[in-house]
Design a protein with these regions (language model features):
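Nucleotide-sugar donor-binding/catalytic module of glycosyltransferases
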Residues: 1-123
Length: 123
């Protein structure tokens, strides 16, 4: 098994945080990765920010969906990685090595799920 990670961000009307979340993904040092962004048809400029990164995305769309889990499932359908990570809009990785650390610190041959801690920085 390779260790390609498909990272999925779902978003709806969060132009304030989408760029920070996307930049967090692009700063990751792990090379075997792809990024999928599912926008629920935002009307606040979110889709325009996503378009700026379109050539760096494995897949993205901006269309009405049936909610956050429908959007996540849409992303999973387009994922080609061995692992799937959900990076919600407004969230970001603790360091530029977060994905690499997750893969390197697991027994990839036996693990079904990789998880880690989170830290709430703003309310």
């Amino acid at each position: 098994m390779s260790n390609k990670i498909s990272v999925i961000t779902v978003v709806y009307n969060d132009v304030k945080h989408i760029r920070e979340t996307m930049e967090s993904f692009f700063s990751q040092t792990w090379e075997e990765k792809e990024y999928i962004v599912i926008d629920g048809g935002s009307t606040d400029g979110t889709a325009e920010v996503i378009k700026e990164y379109a050539d760096r995305l494995a897949y993205w769309c901006s269309e009405k969906d049936a909610g956050v889990y429908d959007a996540m499932n849409k992303g999973v359908q387009h994922a080609s990685g061995d692992w799937v990570n959900i990076l919600n809009c407004g969230d970001y990785y603790f360091s530029d090595h977060s994905l690499a650390d997750a893969i390197r610190n697991c027994d990839a041959g036996n693990a079904d799920i990789i998880y880690g801690d989170s830290m709430k920085l703003r309310q």
